[in-house]
Structures are given as structure tokens and as C-alpha cells.
Amino acid sequence: MTIKVSIDASGGDYGISVTIKAGIKALDVFQDLYLYFVGDESSIKAELNKHLSNTFSSRYTIIHASEVVLMNESPAIALRKKKDSSMRVAINLVKTLKVNACVSAGNTGALMAISRFVLRTIKGIDRPAIMGRMPTMIGHTHMLDLGANVDSKPEALIEFATMGSIAVKHIENIVSPTIGLLNIGEEDMKGSEKIKKTAELLKASNLNYVGFVEGDDIYKGTVNLIVCDGFEGNIALKASEGVVLMMGYYLKQAFTRNLLTKLVALIATPVLRDFKSSLNPGKYNGASLLGLQGIVVKSHGSANVDSFLAAITEAYVEAHAKISDKISLQISKELEHNE
């Protein structure tokens, strides 16, 4: 089966200079991948001519879009006034079933607003949530919501847990993913009333809920899926990225202090390279907008080529696993059971 993915080529901080190169790499990696590059046609052609041989000429299509959603643009304006933006056109391709998934590094708020308007949410899901991977001591875990909803009720958090569990099950091939609820402590008496109510609902569900997890558990790999409100999730995500940058800064300072430390750094280069790779946020780039009638993956706006490739890979994996369809089917079964 050919997997077709639309790329918002003009989106993000670097636009076509990154998205096209990443797309070419993706075509080289995945032999059953077909891409739709959406954006200014002449600019896309010029960039493709710089890097692309005729090897992949039959595996991509360029679709012209005359507008771009700016990174600081109001989601409402992007939705109402920029109907020919590269983001909107790329998402429309998911709606018309021309592609299996869409990837964009554009404005998160605009991407969520346009995706909800064009694709609509799955029946039984009130609001979509953003799910991404976080590095751990033993690999990675998944976490949602990472910023789509900043004041979620317990019922919404249960929806997030259900969607996340289904997605992780099929992405990671885990029969029954373990789920933890992010809290300020593991004890039952800790946390807000909202968190306590959510915990009660999770315990009563059919999900594999194991209890509260704290901030440090995110990186221990205690569970397969961490559920939280988008406010806390986004802070945790950005804090972890900041810590990685700080660690890199201090390591560089330590190893360039004098001739001896530079020699130590030279000897330790393979170890440091592996260390940097395991913590590189770009390696985990590509967050899913779960709950939509279609697959949309959000890339970091500042993604480089390899980071954007990771986002395309995430879309490719989700499309192969038919994540949106699996979520829709499971939610439909639960609705029928509750009637």
C-alpha cells in the first residue's frame, strides 16, 4: 500500500529550505511513500531542482498555495481569511482522502483550528489533544495533552487517555499500554479535585491505569503513556527541552576550559555523540493531533531537516497503522456499549 502524505512546505520558521530536503530524505527512506508538497510552486520547484535527481520524480506532486500562515498569526484570521494557505490546502487533501496524513511545522494554534474546522472531530470526542514522545532512560514514553487544551475537565482527560492508549497500542505494538496520570505526588490524597476525579474515572475504566506519576517519572519510563492537561504538558515539554540545552551548554563549557579538557573531550567523542543523540529533542519531533477524522502531525516550528524528517516518519507510521480509524472504531464501540 502506498502511503500518501501532504507537506505544508511553506510552514515553520524555515519553510521550504527545510521541508523539501526532509521530504527528499523521506522518499529515500520509505519506498512506499508518496508526497504532496504544498506551497509556492515556483519556490518548491527551485528547491527541488537543487537537491533532487530524477529518481523520485514519479513519487511527488507539487500543489500551489498562494498564502502562508505566519508563526505569530491569529488562528481565527488564519482560519477565516487564508483559505489558500499552504497549511489549509495540505489539510484539505486529508479531507478529500487524496492523502493519508498531513505534516506541518506551522503555527500550532492555527493548525489546530484549521484541522478541527476542515476534518472535524471523531464522533464522541469533544476536543482533540496533542500527543508526542518524550525521551526516557529506557527509550521513550508518550504524553498528552501537550498544549491543545489548557483547562481540561476530568471527562476530557479520560478521552485523552482513551485516544492515547489506542494510538500507543498500534504505534508501539503494545497490547495494553500502561497509563499514568501526571500529579504532584503518588499518594491518593495529593493533587487537585480535578486530578482526583480523573483518577477515579480512570480506575473505573477498562484502560490499563497504574496510578499517579510525578514529573521525574516522565524520564524514567515508568509508563507507556502519561496523561495530563495541556497546560502542564506543554510546560513539561518545554522544560525538558530547556534542560537539554542547558546540559549541552555546560558540557561544552567544561570540555573547552583548557587543553586537558579538550583532550578528554576528544577521547570521549563517541560517548558524547551517543549522549547528544539520545537527548536530542529533534529525534522525537512530530506530535499527533489525536481525535480528528484524519491524521495531522505537528512538527516543531524551528525543526531542522532531520527533525522534520522525524515528523514525516511519525505521519508515515500513523498512516500505516490507520490510527485515526482505529480511534474512531473504538470510540464508536464504547458509545454503542453505553447506550
Swiss-Prot record:
Q: Report which reactions are catalysed by this protein.
A: a fatty acyl-[ACP] + phosphate = an acyl phosphate + holo-[ACP]
Q: Where in the cell is it found?
A: Cytoplasm
- Gene Ontology cellular-component terms listed: cytoplasm
Query: Is Lipid biosynthesis there in the keyword field?
Result: yes
In this record, what's one Pfam family? Answer: FA_synthesis
**Top EC group:** transferase
Show the Gene3D superfamilies listed in the entry.
Answer: Isopropylmalate Dehydrogenase (3.40.718.10)
Q: Which domain of life is it from?
A: Bacteria
* GO biological processes: fatty acid biosynthetic process; phospholipid biosynthetic process
Its Gene Ontology molecular function terms?
phosphate:acyl-[acyl carrier protein] acyltransferase activity
Pathway listed for it is: Lipid metabolism; phospholipid metabolism
Decide whether keyword Metal-binding is in the record. no
EC number(s) on file = 2.3.1.274
Give UniProt keywords alphabetically. Cytoplasm, Lipid biosynthesis, Lipid metabolism, Phospholipid biosynthesis, Phospholipid metabolism, Transferase
Stretches that traverse the bilayer: none
What the record says about family reads: Belongs to the PlsX family.
On subunit structure and binding partners, the annotation says: Homodimer. Probably interacts with PlsY.
| Role summary | Catalyzes the reversible formation of acyl-phosphate (acyl-PO(4)) from acyl-[acyl-carrier-protein] (acyl-ACP). This enzyme utilizes acyl-ACP as fatty acyl donor, but not acyl-CoA.
Q: What is this protein called?
A: Phosphate acyltransferase
In its UniProt entry, the species of origin is given as Ruthia magnifica subsp. Calyptogena magnifica
Record gene name: plsX
